[in-house]
UniProtKB/Swiss-Prot annotation:
HAMAP family: Ribosomal_bS18 (MF_00270). GO terms for cellular component: chloroplast; mitochondrial small ribosomal subunit. It holds the Pfam family Ribosomal_S18. This is Small ribosomal subunit protein bS18c. It comes from the Eukaryota. Part of the 30S ribosomal subunit. Belongs to the bacterial ribosomal protein bS18 family. Its main location: plastid. One of its GO terms (biological process) is translation.
Length: 169
């Protein structure tokens, strides 16, 4: 009989973890790490020669009157290009945007480039309409077919009604 006052007996054999599973997982991790290192090295080498020169030189002054500089940072539609595209520092981008806005207000620059914007809109509209199938409801052949189907349905409905009336009489 078991009573609550009896002490808990420890087993004589200690609890052992299986070391094999742990070692296997370690080995697979090492293998994957080695293959990752192999692929990592050639990418580092290829990036070095593609370093580009910044668009703003050391002598360039960021000002609303410097139109040749400002025009480099405006898109074809007249929008201010992002920092990622311009490759500018945050301070330079802020100064450029302020200069562009100032030039627009003082009418040195248009707010939008309407000629390029119209071409852009025409291209985007043609792309949208080209991908979607159009529904032409006003083609005479389709409307005749639709009307004939509707007439057939109405005729069948009338026949059913007549049959009901006859059966009830």
């Amino acid at each position: 009989m078991y009573t609550s006052k009896q002490p808990f007996l420890k087993s004589k054999q200690p609890f052992r973890k299986s070391k094999q599973t742990f070692n296997k997982s370690k080995q697979t991790f090492r293998k994957s790490k080695q293959t990752f290192r192999k692929f990592k090295q050639p990418f580092r080498k290829s990036k070095q020669p593609f370093r580009r020169r910044p668009r703003i030189g050391p002598g360039d002054r960021i000002d609303y009157r410097n139109m040749s500089l400002i025009n480099r940072f405006i898109s074809e539609q007249g929008k201010i290009l992002s920092r990622r595209i311009n490759r500018l520092t945050l301070k330079q981008q802020r100064l450029i945007t302020l200069a562009i806005k100032q030039a627009r207000i003082l009418s040195f620059l248009p707010f939008r480039n309407y000629e390029n914007e119209k071409q852009f809109q025409a291209q985007s509209i043609s792309i949208i309409t080209g991908s979607r199938p159009r529904k032409n409801r006003h083609i005479p052949q389709l409307t005749e077919k639709y009307n004939s189907n509707r007439n057939l349905r109405n005729y069948n409905q009338n026949l059913r009604n007549i049959n009901r009336n006859l059966s009830s009489d």
